[in-house]
Amino acid sequence: MTGLTLDTGALIALERGNRVVAAVLQRAIAANADVALPTTVIAQAMRDPAKQVALNVLMRTSATDIVDLDQPNAVAVGRMLAVSGTSDITDAHVAVTATSRNHTIATNDPGDLAALAPNCKLIQV
């Protein structure tokens, strides 16, 4: 695995103690793989920072790269949405991030992401 990009469902599952997500993250970190968290995913998952310990720890881990929806990413997301005929900015941000880095995607909704990032491996959590 060259790296791992997490979607919102994976972060929520992590917060709920999902062992599959925890194991996937542990394997990625042990392999010195990059872990990417798109900011749109963080925005969807973050509700109470004081109580979301697992998410806060993950965001502070040195292996984690927080991926902003900056101008180049925003343009790539918009293009992906236009081509796919879909409208979920967060899913497209995950797909753009993973595709550009050749990452595996951890998701609880593989259908949407498989359509957006057909060349990325998906791990259902």
Model-based region annotation:
Residues 1-37, 46-64, 123:
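Short, well-structured N-terminal submotif of metal-dependent ribonuclease cores
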Residues 65-110, 123:
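Active-site neighborhoods of divalent-metal-dependent phosphate/nucleic-acid chemistry enzymes
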Residues 111-119:
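Short loop/helix-cap segments at secondary-structure boundaries that form the rim of catalytic
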Residues 10, 47, 91-96, 115:
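Hydrophobic side chains within alpha-helical segments
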Residues 31-32, 61-62, 83, 101, ...:
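Structured helix-beta-strand junction loops
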Residues 119, 124-125:
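Beta-alpha-beta core module
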Residues 44, 54, 76, 115-116:
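Phosphate- and divalent-cation-binding pockets in alpha/beta enzyme and binding domains
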